[in-house]
Every structure is written in structure tokens, then in C-alpha cells.
Amino acid sequence: MKKASIISVGAYIPKDILTNFDLEKMVDTSDEWIVKRTGIKTRHLAKNEVTSDLAYKAALMAIQRAGIDKNDIDAVICATITPDYFCMPSTACKVASNLGLFDVTAFDISAACTGFIYLLEIAKSLVESGAKKNVLIIGAEKLSSIINWQDRSTCVLFGDGAGAAIVSSSDDNYIIDVHTSSDGSKGNLLITPGCGIVHPANKDTIDKKLNFLHMSGNEVFKIAVNTLAKDVVDILEKNSVSSKDIDLFIPHQANLRIIEAVKQRLDFTDEQCVVTVVDYGNTSSASIPMAMNDAYEDGRLKQGSLILLDAFGGGFTWGSALLRFGGK
């Protein structure tokens, strides 16, 4: 049976930076308050770009590093909660078109911050079944477009960006296991209420700020830590791997406090953990591939590295992945 492997990663980080000191001038907050509660110091904003632009630029990097012809890509899948358009066309279709790919499978998924883990599970299935040979997966978000910049509880948390990977078949350094799950009963704790069918876009929903992201932070924090820790234990035990065997633990970059809490529960060292939330904030589905790209560029992510990915997001959704990196 063919095995699926991540053979390359890429990312795109917008140039414009919003610091905590900038936010001090916008809302009732302070650098000290933000850092103490989130660990975040800066985030990047895509002022003159849309989600498909970010995704396209991350995809170009992943394709170049993979050393494959773009025409060998036979599927483009994008995870995003900030698509260019509400219904259609999909962001993936736009990215494929921008790449000059006009006869490929292309579609979006919506799994919030767990999006990249969901993408991995889909790409793994497509490659290992023989349905596809080279799958381009992208997590891309322009969260600045759905943030209420007058709400200090959310506007300090999020940033824009994109991360991409190529998943292909390989005899070694493959994706060992992927687990995804959800619990829709708690979806109201992290939600963008407006602009869907329940609250269609109109003057009333805009006046009530329903088109912005709403989050019950304390409740989400507790559920996230407990769920993430259990999910990691489950996938490690299932595959007879201990935390000491892991070369890099790359969690979703939601909040430094969440990352630290999970790290301590599972006995990961600082050297094992990849942390980028300090510089980029929470970029939802883009955070894991962006963090993988950072680790690759600084030499920590190497061919054959045993990697553990873990994420929790709106829905609620969550998931984890265990893999050996196949990139060069």
C-alpha cells in the first residue's frame, strides 16, 4: 500500500505588522496585559490582499521546495474560515486558477483552527487510495476581516497568513496517523453568528456586529487544554510512541498559555516545542503549516523528523497527526 508523505512546506506572512503598542492606541489594553494573557507581541495583517492571495503565495513556495512541476498537482484543497466569497467560487478554485491549473480537483473545507489536520487526513486518504498523486493543501486566513477591532478580548489574538504543504506518495518518512473529531453542541462558544443563513447579511446583523467573531474565552481555554492533552495521549499510545520520542511538537498557535499548559501536562521540553504565536498571533488553519515552515527555515524540521501536530478550534473541532517529515 502506498504511504502519504509531506514532501514540502511553504508559508506567506503579510508584511504589515500590528504590535501590542499599536493596539494600545485602538482599545483599552496594554502590552503587559496582552503578553500576560496570550504571549502574543505582534501579528501580521494583509491590508491589500485577500485570502486566495495569501494561499497562492504560500503554495508557490511549497511547490518550489517540493521540486515538482505544478502541472503534476492533481488536487488543491484549502482550509479557511475567511474565504474570498461566502458561497462560491471556493478559495481553492481561485488558487488553482492563479497557479494555472484548470483541470484539477479543488475545494475548501471549514474546520477553523483544526483545518490543517483535517486537510492532512483528506490528503492522506487521497494519496494512499491511489486517487491522487500530488495534493496541495493550504491553510489560509484573513482573520482581520472578521475581527471587531473595538473588542479587546478578540482583536488582540488574531493575525493573517497562510501555510501550505505538498502531500505525495513515499516509501518512508510518511504520515503515520491522523485523528480528527468534533463536538457541535458547544459551537456557540466560538462563533461568527452573522452572514450565514441563520443571520443573513443585512443592516440589522451588521449593526449588532454579528458578522464578527465572538468567543467565550475562559470556557474555550479550559475545554481546549483538556481536549488537546487527551488527544495527544491517545495518538501517542495508539502508535506506541512516547513524548520523549518526538522531535518536534507543533501545536496550533492559539495562545501561549494553552501551549504551555499542554506542554507541561505531556512533559514536552522547550526544545521539542515550536512556538510562533508570539510573532504571528492566532492564524487559525494557517498556524500549523506556518509554524512548520518556521521550523523548516531555522533547521529544526528535517527530513525524517518525528513530528506531532495537534489542534483545537471552533465547531468544536480537534485533531492530531503523527508523521515523519519527508522534505529535503
UniProtKB/Swiss-Prot annotation:
It is found in: Cytoplasm. Pfam families: ACP_syn_III, ACP_syn_III_C. Its EC number is 2.3.1.180. It catalyses: malonyl-[ACP] + acetyl-CoA + H(+) = 3-oxobutanoyl-[ACP] + CO2 + CoA. One of its GO terms (biological process) is secondary metabolite biosynthetic process. SUPFAM superfamilies: Thiolase-like (SSF53901). Its main location: cytoplasm. Keywords: Acyltransferase, Cytoplasm, Fatty acid biosynthesis, Fatty acid metabolism, Lipid biosynthesis, Lipid metabolism, Multifunctional enzyme, Transferase. Residues 253-257 are annotated as: ACP-binding. Belongs to the thiolase-like superfamily. FabH family. The last Arg residue of the ACP-binding site is essential for the weak association between ACP/AcpP and FabH. Homodimer. Catalyzes the condensation reaction of fatty acid synthesis by the addition to an acyl acceptor of two carbons from malonyl-ACP. Catalyzes the first condensation reaction which initiates fatty acid synthesis and may therefore play a role in governing the total rate of fatty acid production. Possesses both acetoacetyl-ACP synthase and acetyl transacylase activities. Its substrate specificity determines the biosynthesis of branched-chain and/or straight-chain of fatty acids. This is Beta-ketoacyl-[acyl-carrier-protein] synthase III. It comes from Campylobacter fetus subsp. fetus (strain 82-40).
